[in-house]
Amino acid sequence: IEKRNIVIPFEMRGFGIEKRRHELYKIVKPSRYIKIYYRTSNIDVYTEGYVETCEISNFEELTNGQISIICPDPYWYSNSETVASYSQIIGGFSFPFPKSDEPFIIGQYNSQNLMTVFNSGDEIGCKIIIEGKSESDVSAVNPAIYNADTDEYMQIQGEVLNGDIITITTKTGNKTVTLEREGVKTNIINRLISGSTWLSLREGENNFYLRASEGLTNLKVKIIHINAYLGV
C-alpha cells in the first residue's frame, strides 16, 4: 500500500497574523512528526506522519498557505480499541457488595475458548497477547490461535512459563513475535511453527479459538483491535 500525502490548506484572518505565522513556523517544521485528528458525527480517527512542507504566501492581500504531510502508514485509526479476551476464570467482582444474604458471583469458570472480534473498518492486522498463569513453572506448551472462519492459524512452538508474556503483532510492515520473561524481551519469531499465518481481521465478525498441546486453561489471551480505514 502506498504512503498517503495529506495537504491542508489554510487562511489567516484578523489581527496578529505575523505573530501567528511565526508560531506556526515553530511547530510545523519539515521532517517533524505530526498527528492528525479527523472527527465527524459518525467517525473519530487519527493518522500519523511527518511534515513535508509548510508554504505560506504572506505578500498577498490575504495570508494563506498549505501544509503537506507524508504518512508512511496510509490508514486512519479509530481513537478507541476493542479487546477480546480468554481466561479460564472470568472475574465477577462488583462493588458495592450486595446487602442481602443471597449468593452472588465473584468469579466463574469459562468453558468456552472462542473469542469474537468485530471489525468495523477495513481488513487489518491486530495485536495478540498470550500470558502464562499457573502454579507450576510451565503454564502451557505449543499454544495456537485458530481463525474459525478461514482455518488459518498461528502457533508458537515450545513452553510458555508462568509469568511469560508473548506479544504478536500481525500488521503489515510491523510483524513481530516478542517474549517477555522476567523483564527481558526477546524476539522469538523463529518459534512460529511452519504453516502459521499472520492472522488478520476481515470486515465484520471474526471468530478465533485456542488450542495447546498442554495447559490451555493456564493461558490468558487477548486480541486487541483498532478499526482502520483507508478512506474517511
Tell where the protein language model's regions lie, with residue ranges:
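Long, hydrophobic/aromatic-enriched structural stretches that serve as scaffold segments
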Residues: 4-48
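Short, charged, solvent-exposed linker or helix-capping segments at domain edges/interfaces
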Residues: 77-85
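Intrinsically disordered, low-complexity segments enriched in serine, threonine, and glycine
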Residues: 84-232
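Oligomerization/assembly interface segments of phage tail-like spikes and tubes
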Residues: 1-15, 61-74, 206
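Hydrophobic side chains in beta-strands
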Residues: 10, 38, 51, 71, ...
